[in-house]
Amino acid sequence: MWRKTVRLGLLAIAGLALFTLAVACDEEEAGGPTAAPGVCVPQMPPEGQANLFHNPGFEAGGGPWCSLHLEETPPFEVSQELAHSGESSALLRMRVPAEEGGKAKVFYLVQEVTPEQFPELISGYYRVENWTKGTPKQYLQFVVIAFDVPNLTPAYPNHQMRYPLAGISEEPFNIANAFFVFLGKEEPRTGEWVYFERNIKEDFQQFWGAAPAGFSKLRVLFEVRYDDKEPGTAAAEADVYYDDLYMGPASANPNQP
């Protein structure tokens, strides 16, 4: 089936850790990459909607899901091959050969939003169709980052919660400005949509002592990634779909397991 695909390599800073964010590049089509939005622009909440995400089901294309690096295309495809609802979903393709190693590679969706109040819940669905583990630290997660938060201590440029969904059972690295909460510790199930949800407001209250207030923006990432890959071990491959993503009040959550 002919499909347009998106590939890139990029570099970003998350908190105090520096990661290489890259996506394998191959030329499987003659038409070139799909036109897509650029670097992230923080979004005002959609009017009249509880969901703070714009285009949560990718039915309107790729935007405003974005890139963390200037002049590069967001590292995902809008796919019509599989969808939890509607016709589209976001597809992250990991293709890293065995001979390649490195500290980290992250394949991600990201959106930045500027609500007045910190949201309560994140929910959504993921689906894994291909999973070849190239390192023990290959996993799915979503990450919530609040920037310029005056009411949380210690003072950092941002404060994070990280939520591994599948693939690892221990924290993959130490990071001073983040806490890990595991929503799953097993290898990902393949060939089925898996529901996830978490009350992120309660987690910030529990781990950071309060829900963020007065922040400049929120950044939310949905990822497949690895850390600490040794060259020559095994190829790291994954096809991961995300769909029907929600962030807002728990009472208005449209997703049900």
Regions found by a protein language model. Name each.
Residues 58, 107-147, 197-200, 244-245:
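Extra-cytoplasmic beta-strand recognition segments
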Residues 21-24:
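C-terminal motif of bacterial Sec signal peptides marking the signal peptidase cleavage site
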